[in-house]
A protein has these predicted regions:
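Membrane-helix interface segments in multi-pass membrane proteins
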Residues: 26-57, 156-197, 251, 255-269, ...
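Long, contiguous internal "core" modules enriched in hydrophobic/ aromatic residues
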Residues: 62, 82-177, 181-190, 194-203, ...
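Hydrophobic alpha-helical transmembrane segments
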Residues: 13, 48-52, 93, 143, ...
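Intrinsically disordered cytosolic tails
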Residues: 191-296
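Juxtamembrane inter-helical linkers in multi-pass membrane proteins
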Residues: 1-2, 73-90, 120-142, 206-228, ...
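Short, surface-exposed, polar/charged, turn-prone segments marking secondary-structure boundaries
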Residues: 5, 31-34, 111-113, 161-164, ...
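Transmembrane-helix bundle segments that line or gate the permeation/cavity pathway
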Residues: 1-125
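Hydrophobic alpha-helical transmembrane segments in multi-pass membrane proteins
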Residues: 19, 23-31, 107, 149, ...
Length: 296
């Protein structure tokens, strides 16, 4: 039996309009006032207002991630049973702020903990039918990949210093064969670092999806690093060769990628399933679209 989607374009449009009116206009107005105050010599007050505007966007970014997931679950049907959450996501927005900041404080070494902790918190507040989701992903499962990404720039830098000390880079200029060699090193650095980043994210997604459960159902996400690379290359080619018009199709590609590699296993006892008692919004969650965040 197939899952059904009950959302409408009008809901998403209304959600987007509400975000513009309730958050967008006040944000731009506050930013304009802050700049005007700075121009008139009230630097401290202007800087304070500007900081408030940025912190507000930071906070609403976390709320947006929560409410977007809540909306999608509330519009997903299976045997007329839907999902959702009784939480509005406002407390999650605070968790998103402090956990993200803590993740960056020790030179970024706690970023895997921040990502997995936020995943667990968000999904643990969601439900489908009468049963809540459970998520207990651990940062240790992805830390090795993250450490590889984290240390790669330092290893490359030390390697270039050693090569320079040995005279292997002596005399390299910016033109001719020498320039091409330097360009190749820079290109390898960025492509290699990007590939390691994709490898980390692929491992992260396999870890967190595999640690998510609903009643007796367990989930897995089987996309490999190469699958992610193919997806990103396809995205880039689609946008470039359509002169940017293909951007509107990226969310469909991402959703297809997600559903193709997602697997679920376990037993569903139909007699236990009842309709969800969570609240359903009358409009789509336009926050996430307004902040230009990806569907996955």
């Amino acid at each position: 039996e197939h899952l059904e989607w009950a959302g409408t374009g009008m809901e998403l449009f209304l959600g987007f309009v509400m975000v513009i009116l309730l958050f967008g206009l006040p944000y731009f107005g506050l930013s304009y006032v802050a700049q005007a105050l700075i121009a008139r010599g009230y630097e401290a007050i202007g800087a304070g207002l500007g900081a408030i505007a940025l912190i507000s966007i930071f906070y609403l970014g976390g709320v947006a991630r929560f409410r977007a997931l809540r909306y999608r679950l509330s519009r997903t049907r299976w045997r007329s049973i839907r999902g959702g959450s009784d939480s509005g996501g406002f407390l999650f927005g605070l968790s998103y702020m402090w956990k993200t900041m803590v993740g960056w404080l020790p030179l970024g070494l706690l970023i895997p903990w921040s990502m997995t902790s936020l995943w667990n918190e968000r999904w643990s507040k969601m439900s489908f039918g009468p049963f809540a989701f459970e998520a207990d992903a651990e940062a240790g499962g992805v830390f090795a990949r993250f450490l590889l990404f984290y240390l790669a720039p330092f290893v490359m830098f030390v390697g270039m210093l050693i090569m320079g000390g040995m005279g292997m880079l002596a005399g390299y200029g910016i033109g001719g064969e020498n320039g091409r060699a330097i360009g190749g090193i820079v290109l390898f650095f960025y492509l290699g670092l990007g590939l390691i980043a994709v490898a980390f994210y692929a491992k992260f997604y396999r870890e967190v999806v595999g640690a998510t459960r609903w009643r007796s159902l367990h989930f897995s996400f089987e996309a490999s690093t190469m699958d992610w690379v193919k997806l990103l290359i396809g995205d880039a080619l689609l946008v470039v060769f359509t002169l940017g018009l293909g951007f509107v199709f990226l969310s469909y590609r991402h959703w297809k990628f997600f559903m193709t590699h997602l697997e679920a296993g376990g037993e569903i006892l139909l007699d236990e399933l009842t309709q969800s008692q969570t609240r359903t919004a009358k409009h789509g969650e336009g926050l996430l679209d307004a902040f230009d965040m990806g569907a996955i």
